[in-house]
Amino acid sequence: MTTAKLVIDNLTKSFDGQHLANNHISLEISPAKITAFLGHNGAGKSTFLKILSGKQEPTTGNVSLETGKRMSVLEQDHFAYDQFTILETVLRGNKKMFEIKEEMDALYAKPDFSDEDGIKAGELGVIYDEMGGWNAETDAQTMLSNVGIKEDMHYQMMSELENKDKVRVLLAQALFGNPDVLILDEPTNDLDIDTIAWLEDFLADYENTVIVVSHDRHFLDAVCTHIGDLDYSKLNLYTGNYSYWYQASQLATKQRAQANKKAEEKKKELQEFIARFSSNVAKAKQATARKKMLDKLNIEEIKPTSRRYPAIIFDMEREA
């Protein structure tokens, strides 16, 4: 099995030419990595995911995925599939496979089925087989059962479901068919602890690219291999799970603050020397040298995080 890399090149999204949701973001997200994107409400996470999934266009830059690779996104519109059965909703998660099946069914249903139709149907059948289509319904039913949708519900209409069950069906749809890139926005919402545990195990064994946004710190600790921290429209990457990111980001801020403190002390010392000896002929050269040192001294502006609290992920009481 070949795997796909998602490439993000110089991505910027601005609104009204002023407000930046994302600013010059470039990175490659490789297979077998689960990357979570963190940030306060309004930091640009949702905009970023919409651009990655093709639902929004960036102001500049681009997102590329190898031709023929499939991206699957956890649907946020809980009414989008109300006219379909639960099982069909999941099968529609693999759009190309579903369209091939529909085309084959339409050919076989023709009252004037011709030899040409037979050849075309045969060709489609080969592609369908290569995609695992003949096992698709069984795979979809298994996925539904894994997320807590009982077998006797699989042929119900989506419109008949409560919202908490729609969430599970749409999660099964996103996971169905082994997509090359999987984008999950708040995947643990409305899930019980057993289903979350199953999802954690599923993702731990997943060999393709996963991108996730979640407020469930426990979930992020369990599944993430990388963290992307969106703050002030910029992206900082960390290797590790949520807890590692939190510790590393706090340490980095502390180290920058300590370096700034030393630089400020050095600046004060140089300024005092220059003020004291700049008019002293004997010390003029030393004063000039210190002036050059002062000009080169770099004191980084450290902004406080744009979050209300250092960590945007809050503790959640998981359902039993």
Question: What do these predicted regions represent?
Answer:
Residues T2, N10, L52, N163-D165, ...:
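Short alpha-helical segments used as structural interaction elements across diverse proteins
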Residues A4, D216, L220, R290:
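Hydrophobic (often cysteine-bearing) scaffold residues that line and stabilize catalytic clefts
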Residues A248-L297, E301:
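Intracellular alpha-helical coupling/juxtamembrane segments of multi-pass membrane proteins
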Residues K13-H19, N23-N260, F314-A320:
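ABC ATP-binding cassette signature C-motif
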Residues I127, Q271-S279, P310-D315:
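Alpha-helical coupling/stalk and coiled-coil linker elements that connect catalytic or binding modules
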